[in-house]
Structures are given as structure tokens and as C-alpha cells.
Amino acid sequence: VPTLSTASPPPRLADTASRHPRSDPPHKGDGGRRASDSRITAGIIALAAITLLIGGAFAGLLIEGAHDFSGAWAAFDPYLLRVVRFTLWQAILSTLLSVIPALFVARALSRHPRFFGRAFILQLFAVPLALPAIVAALGILALYGRAGYFAGLFSAIGGRGWPGIYGLSGILVAHVFFNLPLSVRLLLEALQTIPADQWRLASQLGMGARPAFRLIEWPTLRAALPGVAGLVFMLCITSFTIVLTLGGGPAATTLEVGIYQALRFDFDPARAVSLTLLQIALTFIVVLALTRLGANVVGDTNLPVAPRRYLSVNGTEASLNAVLIVLALLFVVGPMAATVVAGLGADLGRLAGEATVRQAMLTSAVLAFLSALLSVMLSLALTMARRALALGRRAGPRTLLEHATDTGAGFVLVVPPIVIGAGWFLLLRHAGDVFAIAPVMVVTVNAVMAMPFALRAVRPAYDAASERHERLCAQLGISGWARLRLVDWPSLRRPLATAFAFAMALSLGDLGVIALFGSDSVQTLPYLLLARMGSYRTEDAAGLALLLGIVCLALVLAADWLGREKVGNV
């Protein structure tokens, strides 16, 4: 535990805390009560902010629906049913195309736990999660589009001009680009939970590859499949940016893109209400199913660096596994390499000199910084309140407030950003210029959307620090800001930095809210990138995509490094 640079209490305070590994609820002493009360109050304020954001969106939908109920009901027409059908169809196809190949790639990586470059491949498979969706879409177009690097090859194979991949094909390729690596990592993590005794016994019995798969690997994969497939399905039905950029027209429209079109192009609030309610219902059903399955809805993984090898692999299987791994690697690396090549081909110097680009970069940086700061503050407040309530409960069932501090941030998974933005758009359009509050909406929505990820980084560290220090802080009456600065900060600085960097990366690359509220006066880098794509300035778009991708990737890598690096004194 790091020593504390203060005259009173003495530096031995942290050492004294380490001699009390178990903490009792701080029921005695005014200091303990003040500490619990202040932490609970902070948690209540955080919950109120989340409730206001989501509740305001629902209020906007309900008010608009009540104002024009007949119009909202009439919006349930064949077009709406066609949009729902396409939303489900593209999500089902994307899930199948992502998860089924991932089974074989994950098994191939599991069967070869040690080979040169394996760790690098797994790191590359984590990169798509760090890329903004619009950057990946540009890379896919640069590779497979009508004027892409592979267009000539595809034209020669097909015997006619390559039409490009706009529409369902482009959506599927982009979804597989994001979700195949994620599925591989999740399934590989499941395979690495197989007990070592089973592998040793299989080796002693001389078990071949097929019996080992049927008796050892498949039961583990079968148990993990529903959660992985459900997570991928949820990501696909809430995919806004990919469908917006690669959909190519009304025939390839999902519910979220329909909401955007109804508000920004058609200005049909009644249809927007109907689409939003359907999107909420669909997302709620999927999240409920994921919760029942115990799926990892955040999608993070924790892969061992040097797993052990148990069974020998014959030459034929090794060759087949190598082909699978190389094909998956090429599929993932291709769009990323195309993004870099196309971006370097743009006039980056001219772009950097444009006032519009500089303003968009500054706006993105400021909004992302504020969003990340707010997300970390809300996450820390909920974490502290949850811990204080748990310590004060002693025994018996958890209270409603404790449940809320534990799972309140998870409700944002049910309500996608475009839905929250649509609700507030409808609520505020009667009060004035909705585009004037674009910065507020971008900061608040992105902050709340990043909270599930921030909580994953902050909560374990705070609980561990509380376990060590709670009793001593109660005895000495250390609470509030003094406790956070002197006692908790040394243990929390890295987790908080991890959460901040990841939340900032998510906000920088987000297009959902700014797509609704953006205007010429408020433009972020993703919004400007979309505008350049819409005006067919593809070289400029490629250059902006490269800049945005580098910044977001650097932030996520920093978050990953901060999360893995151990604090030497803790």
C-alpha cells in the first residue's frame, strides 16, 4: 500500500490498514456514519442523473405519442414491418457469419497455445473493438467498395463491373469484421477454462482430435455459445453507424436508421415514436435473454498469456488450423490496412490546415473529455454508494436502493444512444432550437453509455481498497474528500485512468447522438467525416478516418495498459 504524504495521520496509516484485511460495517462513530451518508448521497445523485436522462427521453416519446396518437398508430404500416424484418434478418445473418467461423478459429488457437505471433494475433483481434464504426466502414469501402483495392479482382472474377458492397452485403461484412474477433476471444476464453485434469487424462488415453472435441471441447463451447451469440445479436440490432454508412438505401434500413431518417430528413415525429418504441422493445427482449444466459454484455475478455499445451496435433490438423488462423487474420487486418493506406494517400497537411477540421477536432476533444470525466464521476459515485449500502446492511436482503446502485447503469444497455437522442429531440423541439443543446446531449448520453465499461474498471479496485481501509477510516473518522484523496486515490488512480481513457475513446468515435443534433455550428470529427462521405470527398474522409482511428486506438491501448499494469506499491 503506498505511503501517504501528509503529516497527520503518520505514514504508517496504510501499513496499519493492511493489518485489518477484513472490514466491519462502520456503524459506530460519527465518522463512519458521515462517510456512508456522503457516499450514499453521491450515489443517489448519480442515479437521479441517469434517471433524468432516460426518463426525459421516454417523456418525449410519450408526449409526442399522446399528441399524435393516431399518427403514431398509423405508422405501424407495411414499411415499418419491413424495417423490423430487415433489422432482425441482418442481425441473424451477422450472428451466424460471426459465431460459426469463430468456433473453428478459437479451437485452432486453443489447440496451438504456443507459436510465434500468437499473442500478437490476439492483440490484433482486439483492435476492431477500439475502432470507431465509421472508421471501419471507410476501411471496408476502401477494400471492397466499387473503387476499392479489390474491385479489379472481383470484376475479373465476375466477368463484369464490380457493383460494390453497399446494402446487406456491406452490413454483413462490417458486422463480421467487428464480431468475429470478439467471438473468437470469448470462445477462446471459454476453452481455456477447461480443467487441466481433463486434458491430462485425454493425453494419457491417447485421445485423438475428434474424440477430444466431442467429449471435452464441445460441451464447453456449447455452454458458451448462447451468451456469445446473444451478445453479437444485440450488437447487430443496435448497429447504427454501420447501417447508416453501408446500407445504401431504403431497402437496407434498420430501426435505428429509420429513427434518424424520420427526424432529420422526413421530420415525421409519429413514425419516429413508433420506430423508437419497437427498438426499445426489441433491445429489452435481447438484454433480458442475455441476462438469463449469464452473457458478458460488456464483451471484455481476460486471456492467459501463456496457456499450457496438453494434446499433440498431427500435421494435417496443424495445417488446417494454420489456414483458419491466417484467413481470419487477413480478414481482420485487411480493412485496417486499407484504412491506413487510404488515409496516407489523402492530403493530411491540407486537412490539418482547414479551419473546419481543426474546429471539429477541438470540439471532439472537448466533448469527449467532458463525457469521460462525467462517466468516471458517475461510475465512482455508484460504486461508493453500493459499497456503503452493502457494509451498512450486515445481513438480510438487499434494499431497492442497493439494487439500483448495483445495476442502474446496466439499464442504458436497453436504451441505445439514438433512442435517447430521439426522445430528447422530440421533447425539446417545442422549447426552442434543439441543435443548440447538441454539446450537452453528446456529453451526457456518451457519458452514461460508457458507464458499464467504466464500472468494470473501477468497482473491483474500490471494493478491494474498501476491504482494506474501511474499518480504519471509520475508527479515525476519515471520510469524504479527505478519504478519497489520502486513502482511496493510490488504489484508484490507475482504474480511474483506465475508465477515463476508454470512455473518452467511445465518445470520440460515437456518431449516434451527434447525427441527430449535429449542425454546421457543432460538428465533431465523426460528423464531419460522415459529411465528407456524403459529398463524395472520399480522400478527405479517408484522411479524417485515419486521424480518428489513431487517436481512438491510442486511447484504448492506453486504457488496456493501465488496466493490466500493476501498481508496485499496492
Could you tell me what each predicted segment is?
Residues 1-45, 113-118, 210, 290-326, ...:
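Transmembrane alpha-helical segments of polytopic membrane transport and secretion proteins
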Residues 78, 113-116, 192-197, 207-210, ...:
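Juxtamembrane helix-boundary/capping and inter-helix hinge elements in multi-pass membrane proteins
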Residues 142, 241-267, 511-538:
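Glycine-rich helix-loop "coupling/hinge" segments at transmembrane-helix boundaries
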Residues 192-221, 265, 389, 471-492:
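Short helix-to-coil transition segments within interhelical loops
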